[in-house]
Amino acid sequence: QTKFWQTGMIECGVKYGLSSTNNHMTTDSIFNDIPLSQTPQDFRYDEHVAAAYISVGKQFGEHWSVKLGLRGEYTYSFGNWLSADSVTRRSYFNPFPTAYIGYTTSPLGNLQQPIAVSASYTRRIKRPNYWMLNPFRTYVDAYSYQEGNTALTPEFNNDVELHFSWTQYLNVTFNFAHTQDMFSQKTTILPDGMGYTKWINFGTCTTHGGNLSLTELPLVPKYVTAEDGTKTMQGAWLALTVNAGWFHFINKSYEKNAEGKSAYENRTHYGYVGGTLSAYLPKDWTLTFDGNWSSPMTTGYNKQGSMYFLSFGVRKMYMPKGLIFNLNIQDLARSLSMVDKSEGMAPGYESWHENYVRQQRVMLSITWMFGQYQQHKNRKVGNMDELNRLGGGGGVQTGN
């Protein structure tokens, strides 16, 4: 990176990533201690991603800032899916532009900005997780199974945001996004009644909506009296943090009906709200109460049910000794459950499952700070994108 015209900055860089998976696995079917069959799961998958980017930013006066950027990515992938007796090769290049313009009523660099407004545009790529590509068949029960899709291609997202902030407390964001080749799982009913679920590039998803967040808004301010008798606010006895949003979804499948229109189209709404109420008591005691709720949401062929979650925490600090005691109680109402339903199936069929996640727990932690504290900034570079695509298990999974 280099500066120009005092307040301008040019940055450029390159990145190369290689991921290679060589999987050998055999699944044994056993009934009454008698081996029935062996199913191999052998494949080799290599992916090369080469990228280069350049961005130019400039401050104009004390209130305006502009930034433009462009990233180009070339991808080559090879998959030898031995168990499925198929080979896939892909080679493609994609540009990803970005643009940003911002205005503040106070000089740039002032942390106590009274009002700030910005607008941005970004284009992103999301490659399928490796387990989405794995064609290995996983049986859910005697009448259904699921598998990956070696022909799955990346999805692309175009996002436009208008952001407004007031001091350090209030942030409001209006968002419009359009996703192409969106990932979704589709359940198909076979003539024998067996159902199978497979990852596909569903189609497009268009969303628009907004988000509002309040950060540590003082409900009961704490005042400090100076020697001359003047009072100034310093923190709060009771503070509220809230994050809420509402979005409208339009899902359209690439699959067409006899009239040439999308065979499946769904228009739904989605909303969520979460908040934390913090009480800062004398002698460094802190009480927190957290609550989160989200409405049902439909993306592609998949519909998720609503859920809510409650937690409570107590913290005690002994600053002279550098000791911090934390007691947290999660899922107070034992309410955390997830309901998923498959849409767009054959008439007369429906598929849904409910998963109860037992997250109710009590955690006690003790932190002792000593010596000189130094904050280290971790920069995410290299293979972070590839690691995220491995899934929670840290390796290639056979299902979702």
Annotated model-derived regions:
Residues Y318-N400:
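C-terminal beta-signal and adjacent terminal beta-strands/loops
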Residues Y16-N22, G72-F78, Y103-T105, Y121-R127, ...:
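Transmembrane beta-strands of outer-membrane beta-barrel pores
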Residues Q41-Y45, I125-H178, T197-V220, H353, ...:
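Outer-membrane beta-barrel signature, preferentially recognizing the C-terminal barrel domain
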Residues Q1-N80, S106-N110, T207-G245:
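Face-selective signature of the C-terminal outer-membrane beta-barrel domain
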Residues E47-V87, S91-G102, L108-D159, F174-Y196, T241-W246, Y272-P296, Q330-P347:
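Surface-exposed extracellular loop regions of Gram-negative outer-membrane beta-barrel proteins
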Residues W5-I10, H63-V66, S106-L111, I115-V117, ...:
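Repeated loop/turn-to-beta-strand initiation elements of outer-membrane beta-barrel proteins
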Residues F202-N292:
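Gram-negative outer-membrane beta-barrel transporters
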